[in-house]
Structures are given as C-alpha cells and as structure tokens.
Amino acid sequence: MYPPCSLYVSKHFNLSFRSNFHISIASVDEHNNPTVTPIGSLLLNDNQTGFYFEKYPKKLPIHAEGNPNVCVLGVNSSTLFWLKSLFKNKFKEYPGIKLYGQLGAKRKATEHETKRLQRRMKATKLLKGNAYLWCHMQYVRDISFTKAEKINLGDMTDHL
C-alpha cells in the first residue's frame, strides 16, 4: 500500500472531500465503544501527518485523552466515478482509503493552516453557511499517520 500522505493518498482524500464535503474519523470512547465523527476540515501534509480544525467536535477530543488511536476514512462518492466503475465492472482507482494514526494535542492554528482551509472552502465562499461553518476556526489538532490501507471491493479492485 502507499505510505500515509503520499501524493496518491492526498489526491484521493481531496477527491473524497470534493464528493462528500467531509471525511470520517473513527475513535473509541472510554467504554471501548466505537464512534465515528464527520470532519470537514482535515488537511494532509506531506510528512505522514495532517490536522483538522477542532471547532465543532465534542466527543473526539475526549476520546483522544483516553485513547489517541484513530482511523480516518476517505471515500470517493462521486456519482460519475461510481457509475463508470459499475458500468465497466472495475474501478480505475480505489474507492476508499483508510489512514491509521494518533491524535496529537489541540493547539492554535498557524496563519498558513488557516489559509489552507480558506483555499479549500473557496468554492462555498459566497454561500451563507460558509461564514457560519468556516469562519473563526482558531484551533487544530494534529494527526500523525502510521499506515494507509486501501478499500478492496473484490474483482472490481483486484487489478489495482
């Protein structure tokens, strides 16, 4: 599999965000119950790390205190991507990738990180909800990734 945050993985997560406007981060609570949190602000770096803006998640930061291990799932949900794949009975790229890693500490976002988020949200800049959701994002939480895993769908992904 590809190293976490390789060019291919970064491209896949960008496509996943474009088709879903979020990725999913799985964590476990204090009773070892799994839970999934949708995150719309995950950005990957090129050194097997990433970060997300932590304005809305409430449970994920609590889970990080007891168990910082997470699994990040990015799925390309583009209708055209899926229809082409179903028509041809094969995918040209993996439909999903999971990244395994650990959450770091919450910290103040840098100006560069804030600009990266603004660039990602540029397409929704003129919409009312953009200001509500994406303005005043001040804090990020780092994630260091240890492993990337492709999502296999039998014969449709065997050739990849």
Describe the role of every protein-language-model region.
Residues 1-160:
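Binding-site signature for planar aromatic cofactors or substrates
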